[in-house]
């Protein structure tokens, strides 16, 4: 897919990730949102390639093809953070985040309510991740951005509308 129509935004996100990687910053998170089919997942991969990182996607299904439970996906994310922290030039992509955290339309609110984890615990996970992560949602979160940790909010319809 051609993203030339958002070249400035693509360059901005790429520079942000390059600096974060070079300086080994922790807590680097980007939230992309937009309607289904707008190319959010492809854009995340393009950004990864442009920055020179390998993009690792958190699975949505088991090896048997069954949907993973929300907690299993978040556990996979935490494991990937630990494993990839030792691998330079890695980027995590967590797609379809609203399927995992459907209530409240926030990627973190329903997980917080259903798992018993507090907002503070979730924020700590985001603020301390060693590997930059791109979180992808088909809808805008319904929560003030400052209350879900260190996330660069980036929409895709059009970007920086």
What are these regions, as identified by a protein language model?
Residues 87-92, 127-134:
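Loop/turn-to-beta-strand initiation segments
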Residues 55-87:
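Short glycine-rich substrate-engagement loop in P-loop NTPases that contacts/grips substrate
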Residues 95-97:
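Walker B catalytic acidic pair
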Residues 23-43:
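Walker A/P-loop nucleotide-binding motif
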Residues 2-30:
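Pre-Walker A (pre-P-loop) alpha-helix and adjacent loop at the N terminus of AAA/AAA+ ATPase modules
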Residues 72-76, 105-128:
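Substrate-gripping "pore-loop 1 plus following alpha2 helix"
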Residues 125, 137-151:
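Short regulatory helix/loop adjacent to the ATP-binding pocket of P-loop NTPases
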